[in-house]
Amino acid sequence: MSNHPIPHKLKTFGPSKKLNDTGFLHIEGDQKIYPPFFDLNAIEQLRENWETQANDIFICTHQKVGTHLTKQFVSEILRAVYSYPENNPMASGDIGHATIPWPEVMVSQHGYAHFQDFLVKTADSPRVWYLHCENDDLPMKKIHPESKFIYVYRNPKGAAVSQYFFYKSHPLLEVNPAIEMDEFV
């Protein structure tokens, strides 16, 4: 269990291991490394079953390159153009996981039935997802040819500084909060 001063609320799936002496707790599967709050079975469910729709918009980023800012921009543009019904999470203007989900986390933390409910609630209007993976690792069975992808890039130096502060403060990664930038990089 983590000795980090800030607790986390995510379910974790093991066995987790540290990538090195300074932390970076992750799990391994399919010869890849995943965050410990991913359930590898959930990823497999998505890859076997999820077929995207024409109205799906994907924000594809590496962590700490502007994901939340991009989610905010896209949400505001869509809400200005479309009238979302009240039961659609996008109607709220919120950009959290319940509105603009990270599919692997949604299924890992809440189950595939919750994911399917989200698909039904949002089927008739543009819906937004965000992903932190490479194209070869997209968690879907089939991509609709009209689905849209927004790729966000950032200067690697700025991303490294942002990652440094994020990793130090994220309890689930078990990085020593006292780690220095030179050691981190």
Name these PLM-found stretches.
Residues 1-185:
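PAPS-dependent sulfotransferase catalytic domain
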